[in-house]
Swiss-Prot record:
Coiled-coil residue spans: 75-107, 158-189, 261-287
Annotated tissue distribution: Expressed in most regions of the brain (at protein level).
Transmembrane segments: none
Protein's UniProt name: Protein FAM81A
Taxonomic source organism: Mus musculus
Membership in a protein family: Belongs to the FAM81 family.
Amino acid sequence: MHLRRVKTMPRHSQSLTMAPYSSVSLVEQLEDRILCHEKTTAALVEHAFRIKDDIVSSLQKMQNKGGGDRLARLFLEEHIRNITAIVKQLNRDIEVLQEQIRARDNISYGTNSALKTLEMRQLSGLGDLRGRVARCDASIARLSAEHKSTYEGLQHLNKEQQAAKLILETKIKDAEGQISQLLSRVDLSISEQSTKLKMSHRDSNHQLQLLDTKFKGTVEELSNQILSARSWLQQEQERIEKELLQKIDHLSLIVKENSGANERDVEKKLSQMSARLDKIEESQKRNAEGQRKPDEEKVHGRISKLELQMTEDMKEMKAEVNAGFSAIYESIGSLRQVLEAKMKLDRDQLQKQIQQMQKPETAM
């Protein structure tokens, strides 16, 4: 025979300020458990009576059959044990139920006290809320009056803002027109300066080309003169050599014809002729060297003069170009400074106007 065990509820310390919803749930749990215990006790009692009926019927059968004392005693002992177990279980269940009833009483007392404190608090809260509602009504009336005055002020400020916005838009348009005019002037001045720079570059390049062609022509002329002088010197040298050879041949013929003459006279004549020839060669060499040196000096002098003239012309051209560039750069810089100053002034005026327009907006 198996007995049903009843679950007991653990003891918990219940505080006086317990929430009403939790107390109600605990009461419902206790009632459910009491019903469960009643059902189990009823089932156990029914089971005990059924066992008793079985024992009585078995004893009657054994008495009818005879010799069943021992078996009857065993059934009685088992029945007594079951009854004692049932009684013990019932005692335990009764104790548990008593404890649960005490806990329920404590919980109900705590819930009642909590409800009383809640009622007191609600009453005090209601009085406080009524005072707050009265204060809120007064503040709402005051705020409505302030809202009306602020709304009127906002409408007035909105009108002023629209008027100031129109004025600012017109001023911005005027400033934009002035800025566009200034930019167009700047573009025109820059284009004029660029055209001037291009013209000055072209003029300087043209002058440099002219100087280059002039220098090349002078160099070619000097080279032609040097070549002509060299060819003339070679021709003179060849002519003198031919004349000397002709004279030597003539002297050799004379010597052959006058072979019978005195050898001393011939030797004297030959020595005189050789001396004359030496003198003629020396004089020709001197003349050639004298002519070559002044020609070379003349050529070198002309080349140095041309070089000096070229360097002076180049220096003058560079000075003119640099002066033109510096004047152009100075004019561009001054124009840029003037434009930057004017744009800065216009920007400052616009910022001041925008700040003046933003002040009423921030106040709104």
